Amino acid sequence: MKISPQVYVTGSLEAVEMYCKAFGAEISFQIKTEENTYAHCELTVNGQLFLAISEAPFDCDHNKEHVWQNMAFNVYEMGTEEAVRNAYEVLSDGGTVIDTLGPCDWNAYCANVIDKFGVFWWIAI
């Protein structure tokens, strides 16, 4: 059995570009709609499925204010502080920073961010 995360967003082309930039991901599979959005797009990092993205079938209501999500994507063992900082800068642009970059009780360098698509990320070294 396998499990993989998928997000549904308004603005799937922009979201794919942003996640590729934030995490060094590559598009490994894609199906576009007649409206030039993604019906389904799979991103890989180091040859492993990282995230799937699809255009939301209706206009998503994204509250960009400080809202606690009931689900988060935890991306850890990113290798360097520079990798974490890059992801933080990309994801926080237009999003909401919950916890700024720095140490916490269980990690030396991490942050919590809700990106401009309403997706909650915990990123860490």
Provide a role label for each language-model segment.
Residues 1-31, 37-99, 112-125:
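Glyoxalase I/VOC metalloenzyme domain signal
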Residues 37, 105-108:
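Short, small/polar residue-rich loop motifs at catalytic or cofactor-binding pockets
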